Amino acid sequence: MTLIRFVAALFVFLLVAAPSLAQDRRVPSSAAELRLSYAPIVQRVQPAVVNVYAAKVVQNHNPFLDDPLFRRFFGIPGQPEQMQRSLGSGVMVDPSGLVVTNVHVIEGADQVKVSLSDKREFEAEIVLKDPRSDLAVLRLKDSHEKFPTLDFANSDELMVGDVVLAIGNPFGVGQTVTHGIVSALARTQVGITDYQFFIQTDAAINPGNSGGALVDMTGRLVGINTAIFSRSGGSQGIGFAIPSNMVRVVAASAKSGGKAVRRPWLGAHLQAVTPDIADSLGLKTPSGALVASVLPDSPAAHAGLKASDLIVAIDGQPIDDPNAFDYRFVTHPLGGTSEIDVLRGGKTLKLSVALETAPDTNRNEIKLEGRSPFQGATVANISPAVADEMHLDADTDGVVMTEIADGSAAANVGFQKGDIIQAVNNKRIGKTGDLDKVSREQARLWRITLLRGGQQINVTLGG
C-alpha cells in the first residue's frame, strides 16, 4: 500500500507543476505545490472541446445481394439501407465556430452534429478534409456568437516526460479528462496517415476520443488525439496525437477559405537509410533521408539537390528518416525558403529550397458512371500535385483512381484507391477523358492493365 501511495504522489507532482513546468521544468519546492489541482486548466480548456456526432446511410450486408447479376435477375435495385452513427471529439480553433477533428470521425457522413460542453447542439458542415493528415475542419451552422477556442502550442518544444491532459468523449459517455505524460516524440511507424510524426502519450485515450484535445500545463493545444495501440479495443497506455504544428497548418487553410491544404512540395523521392547504406556511406548510425531521385524543374532541382544526397537536417532540426523530413518540410508556411543540410561525397552542404506548391496541371477529375466495372470510381490525371498527394511517380502513364464509392461496381470488383489504369481493351489510357469514353462502351469482356504498388497487373472482367 505504501508503494501505491508513493506512486500516486509521484504522479501528482509530475502532473501538477502548473505554469512553471512549461518554462523551467523544476521539481516542487513545497508540500503546497503537491496539492495543486488540474481543475483551473480543465476549466479553461473544456469549453473549447466538443463532441462530434456523424451519421451516414449505409446498406445492410447480404452476401447474395452483393452479386450484381443476382440483383438484375430478380429485379432487386440494391441492398436495404440503414443509418450508421459514429462519435468522436473536436476542438474549437476559431471564434467563428471552426472545429478541428479527425477525417475518420466524419468520413462519408451525410449529417454532422457538434455538441458543446454546455449541452447545446449545432448542425455542422464539413469545410475541409485532409486525408493525408487525417484532419478535418467543420463549421457550425446558424451560429452568430463568438466561441471559446484553444491557443496552439509549438509542438516542437515538447519534451518526453512533459505532462499532458487528454480531453474528449470516450465511448460517448460525455466529456472526460485524463492525464499522463509525453511518452515519446516523432513516432513514425504508426501507419495511419501520410505524415508519420506522432506524439505518443500514456494519457488514457479510448474510442470516441478521436479528434479531441491533448493540452499542456498552460492549457494550450499540443496535439489532436487520433489513434491508440490496443489488443482489447480500449486504452492500454499507448495513444497517438497529431502534433499541433500540423493542426495549425490545416486550420489556417480552412480559416483562409481553402477547400484543400496547400503545402510546400520538394519534388524529390526520398528513402530510408538502412544499416547497409549507412555502412557504405561511412555513417555511424542509419539516419537521415536519402535522395533516390529528383524531378526536373522542381524546387529540389532548382536548389541543386541530387540523387544520392543524404538530407541530415532542415532549418537546424535533425532528420532521422524520410517521415521526419516530410513532416518538418510541409509544416513550413508557403513562400520564402528552407535551409537543408545534405551530405555529399563526405562533405556537408547547405541548400536553400523554395517553399512552393506542386504545379497542379489539369487533373480533370471525373466520377465514372454507366455499367462498366469502373462505375463509382473517381479518376484524375497524374499531375505533379496528384503524384505528390498519392505518392506516385509524376511521369507515370495512365490515370489514377482517387476515390472508390462504397457499394459501386468498382468497389465490388476490387479496384483500390491509388490504382493506375493504363489500358482498357488494348486502348491506351492517357487521360481521364480516354477512360470515360472507353467505360461508356458496351463490352462482354474488359481487359484491363493497371499499376498497383508499382507492379503491373493484367486482369479480365466480365461485362
Predicted regions and their residues:
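Cleft-lining beta-strand/loop regions that shape enzyme active-site pockets
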Residues: 148-154, 162-165, 207-210, 378
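Bacterial N-terminal signal peptides
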Residues: 7-17
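Residue-level recognition of beta-strand microenvironments
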Residues: 52-55, 95, 102, 127-129, ...
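Active-site loop architecture of trypsin-fold serine endopeptidases
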Residues: 25-26, 31, 38, 60-62, ...
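C-terminal recognition in membrane/secretory proteostasis and scaffolding
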Residues: 2-5, 21-29, 36-40, 89-91, ...
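Short, acidic, Ser/Thr-enriched surface-loop or helix-capping motifs
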Residues: 87, 93-94, 116, 121, ...
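Glycine-biased strand-turn-strand hairpin within the trypsin-fold
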Residues: 23-40, 44-99, 107-109, 120, ...
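Short glycine/Trp-rich loop-beta-loop segment that forms part of the substrate-binding cleft
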Residues: 98, 120, 153-174, 254
